[in-house]
Amino acid sequence: MNFETIIGLEVHVELNTNSKIFSPSSAHFGEDPNASTNVIDWSFPGVLPVMNKGVIDAGIKAALALNMSIHQHMHFDRKNYFYPDNPKAYQISQFDEPIGYNGWIDITLEDGSTKKIRIERAHLEEDAGKNTHGTDGYSYVDLNRQGVPLIEIVSEADMRSPEEAYAYLTALKEIIQYTGISDVKMEEGSMRVDANISLRPYGQEAFGTKTELKNLNSFSNVRKGLEFEVERQAKILRSGGVIRQETRRYDEASKGTILMRVKEGAADYRYFPEPDLPLFEIDDAWIEDMRAELPRFPADRRASYINALGLSAYDAGQLTATKALSDFFEQAVALGGDPKQVSNWLQGEMAQFLNAEGKTIDQIALTPENLVEMIAIITDGTISSKIAKKVFVHLAKHGGSARAYVEKAGLVQISDPAVLIPIIHQVFADNEAAVADFKSGKRNADKAFTGFLMKATKGQANPQIAQQLLAQELQKLLD
């Protein structure tokens, strides 16, 4: 029997506010254990939460970016459970009235087609702390993360393969990153994914029993974990077994999933309205203010790059990988840069430089103005493409005018025949054996002179003019 795969994803995104959702403690990553905490985070008796307005701002932006309706009469709820990293013994979250609901995004599949994935809800909540189990036999609790604001984005079970889940996460990460509400760095825990997966016979409408997967710390592991679960569940069902509703974690060492616990339901958490926070009214003006702060999103930019600028779908996809890169490209084109040439430099030398330096595009000195000027002096013959690579590295590290640097460093391309011909004659004089080979009929010997000339001019000879003059002067040797 063959089965259809049913996948839904729950994505937790940490919001990049300066302070936590209900306390003034820092929400920044990387502090010493328990350095970013106060009495609210430790749940001392009598302390009360105070709402961070910036969190609601971010929630509205996320809902709008994901094509969601917004609950304009919004409240918070208590989700009750006990765990050492949760000192209150409950989490402040949203249950029946999340900030966003009924949304969707389009994903691009491997064959280039698109598919709409519905999003059930997006709700705001506080993050829990972190438990660390030491080699000394003790467990340690770090509450720096306790109270860091989260938005949990819950998709409908619309994905039918691990590949579709991967494409959904890629598109979702792009959109959230463009809004500026999170850096969505999985390596720092600011984007975390839980996956729900079940199988059903083809033609059956009812969903099968789902399994929740955790410990999916990369998009690649999401795909691998789901692929393993498809095989595991199919094997059980084909043998006449029954799938239990349970939570499993992906184990990188074994490339499989391991049982954690029997899955709880909503009733186990005993949700009820949070009594220490008021009802929040989100009026139309607030929503429109947040809408005005949103950028053009990747899909719109890609379409523009393809249809208006004539770029390939591949180039458009690469250029919209991050908002910073896309903004840089658009600014360079607006300044008169040729779209294809700008694209080539950003995907080539820029990508290599950023990778080698471990930096992002907004951390280097090169500006769109610098790049456009550099491309212009390549086009007008002031420098060669080879020299331009050296110029690019200098500009990326130090900024400034490309033309001024080229002139100061003596990198201007030599195009004047009156300058090049004497150098060619000197090359002949310095390489008598090669000249003799050429005169004796070893015609391939002429190729060596190109290298000799470029070495003599330190790579500054104009390649086209140099080739013409070399051919001219070599012919004279035979006359």
Swiss-Prot record:
Gene Ontology molecular function: any one: ATP binding
Keywords: ATP-binding, Ligase, Nucleotide-binding, Protein biosynthesis
Pfam families: GatB_N, GatB_Yqey
Enzyme nomenclature, EC number: 6.3.5.-
Domain of life: Bacteria
PROSITE patterns: GATB
Coiled-coil region(s): none
Catalytic reaction(s) noted: L-glutamyl-tRNA(Gln) + L-glutamine + ATP + H2O = L-glutaminyl-tRNA(Gln) + L-glutamate + ADP + phosphate + H(+); L-aspartyl-tRNA(Asn) + L-glutamine + ATP + H2O = L-asparaginyl-tRNA(Asn) + L-glutamate + ADP + phosphate + 2 H(+)
SMART domains: GatB_Yqey
Protein's GO biological process: glutaminyl-tRNAGln biosynthesis via transamidation; translation
Protein family per UniProt: Belongs to the GatB/GatE family. GatB subfamily.
PANTHER family: GLUTAMYL-TRNA GLN AMIDOTRANSFERASE SUBUNIT B MITOCHONDRIAL AND PROKARYOTIC PET112-RELATED, GLUTAMYL-TRNA(GLN) AMIDOTRANSFERASE SUBUNIT B, MITOCHONDRIAL
NCBIfam families according to UniProt: gatB (TIGR00133), PRK05477.1-1 (NF004011), PRK05477.1-2 (NF004012), PRK05477.1-4 (NF004014)
Function: Allows the formation of correctly charged Asn-tRNA(Asn) or Gln-tRNA(Gln) through the transamidation of misacylated Asp-tRNA(Asn) or Glu-tRNA(Gln) in organisms which lack either or both of asparaginyl-tRNA or glutaminyl-tRNA synthetases. The reaction takes place in the presence of glutamine and ATP through an activated phospho-Asp-tRNA(Asn) or phospho-Glu-tRNA(Gln).
Oligomer and partners: Heterotrimer of A, B and C subunits.
Protein name per the record: Aspartyl/glutamyl-tRNA(Asn/Gln) amidotransferase subunit B
Biological source species: Streptococcus equi subsp. equi (strain 4047)
Gene: gatB
